[in-house]
Regions:
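Long, low-complexity, charge-biased intrinsically disordered regions
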Residues: 1-130
Length: 130
């Protein structure tokens, strides 16, 4: 926030953007097997989306002794809440900015800078969980 206040004080242009579902833009590496176990209503929803999932439904007994339907799916993209997702998103973000000629600030990895036509351009990012 202090950066935005300082930039406004200096008369710099400021723009804000949001990346909806940011973590979903990053892919899990091929050597990682992240398996998601879906049960109950989620299996019904998945089968409604694609009937082929019906062939992959398995039945298990839960801790209460009740038989429940389960669907195991391999996660291909980073999922919000997975430990590695934040890292994968940051890696994608920083690599993309580097390819565009921005330099990641070594003291604050959430800031990237680039000089274009003698003007400094700064990208600052943060995670908003609201």
């Amino acid at each position: 926030m202090a950066t935005l206040v300082f930039d406004a004080y200096k008369g710099r242009d400021i723009a804000m953007a949001d990346v909806p579902g940011a973590s979903l833009h990053a892919e899990f590496p091929n050597d990682k097997n992240v398996i998601l176990r879906m049960t109950d209503i989620f299996t019904d929803i998945m089968c409604e989306i694609n009937e082929e999932y019906k062939d992959h439904i398995v039945y298990e007994v839960n801790k209460h002794g009740k038989r429940v339907q389960c669907l195991y799916v391999k996660v291909l993209r980073a999922l919000y809440g997975c430990l590695e997702s934040a890292f994968l998103w940051y890696q994608l973000y920083s690599e993309t900015l580097s390819k565009l000629g921005f330099e990641i600030n070594p003291y604050d990895r959430c800031v990237a800078n680039k000089i274009i036509d003698s003007k400094q351009y700064m990208i600052l990012f943060y995670v908003d969980d609201n």
